[in-house]
Amino acid sequence: MIQEGKLEQQFFDYLHSERNYSVNTSTAYENDLLDFRRFLNEQAITTYQQVTFLDVRIYLTELKQKSFSRTTVARKISSLRSFYTFLLRENVINENPFTYVSHAKNQLRLPKFFYSEEMEALFQVVYEDNETLTLRDRVLLEVLYGTGIRVSECAGILLPDLDTSYQAILIRGKGNKERYVPFGAYAEDAITDYLPERVNLMSRYKKSHDALLVNHYGDPLTTRGIRYCLTKIISKASLTRKIHPHMLRHTFATDLLNNGADMRTVQELLGHASLSSTQIYTHVTKEHLKSTYMKHHPRA
């Protein structure tokens, strides 16, 4: 049975001291957490770490059956998402089970992904010339799309992490969990072309480190720097809809499932602690199939 303890108190202290929430708002959060804890105890779930996306769906169904207003449900979702975001920040959990639950409609918030023509436009940008930073961006795009790793994980890749004989990269994920992810021929060729230019750039600025990706001064490329580079690539590709770099990870998972990969393998490649975090992509692939049908079938 889950009882109120140190985690909850730390969260409430965080709301008061760092978020400056009012007493009324904090009380609402406490009540929402109390109600969720009651539900977990009824489900024989003994720790917050055990909660999965499917448990969240069951809880939302229960709220709907109790005829809570949409506003109340949205507030409860917001409270619990904030609590789990706090647990994630404190390294208590590896995945936030509330990530893909929508505030407004109490529905899944499906991950967005790139369509094939959009991916082609992105790759055209990084293959337009062989300048040093273009070669770097080519590695960036080929590795992110080819492995599905997070932007933060990409920033942490060191040269010793590359195993070119097996075409695999050692990745340090959330909670410092390590996993090997394979990469394909395109990524291998991009890395091979880039490494000599990386050496030249670092020598020019007298830099010495093992980071795979570097900026224009030869320093390690940070997570923020990677996001900036990707934003520039997206801008050059003239893609019109609202796009964010994490969509490359979503596209990796969606493309694998669309082409017959099994769920467990995709889970392992993504570094998801829970299979429920990966199951969200089955909804994406169904939506993709439906949208493709509606777009291309003459009788749709």
From Swiss-Prot:
Active site annotation, chain numbering: 150, 174, 246, 249, 272, 281
Q: One GO biological process from the UniProt record?
A: cell division
InterPro entries according to UniProt: CB, DNA_brk_join_enz, Integrase-like_cat_sf, Integrase_catalytic, Integrase_recombinase_N, Integrase_SAM-like_N, Recomb_XerC, Tyrosine_recombinase_XerC/XerD
- Cited CDD domains: INT_XerDC_C (cd00798)
Output the Gene Ontology cellular-component terms: cytoplasm
- Principal subcellular localization: cytoplasm
Alphabetical list of Gene3D superfamilies matching this protein: 1.10.150.130, Intergrase catalytic core
The UniProt entry, under NCBIfam families, shows: PRK00283.1, recomb_XerC
Q: Could you tell me what this protein does?
A: Site-specific tyrosine recombinase, which acts by catalyzing the cutting and rejoining of the recombining DNA molecules. The XerC-XerD complex is essential to convert dimers of the bacterial chromosome into monomers to permit their segregation at cell division. It also contributes to the segregational stability of plasmids.
Report what the protein is called.
Answer: Tyrosine recombinase XerC
UniProt source species? Listeria monocytogenes serovar 1/2a (strain ATCC BAA-679 / EGD-e)
**Lineage, top ranks:** Bacteria, Bacillati, Bacillota, Bacilli, Bacillales
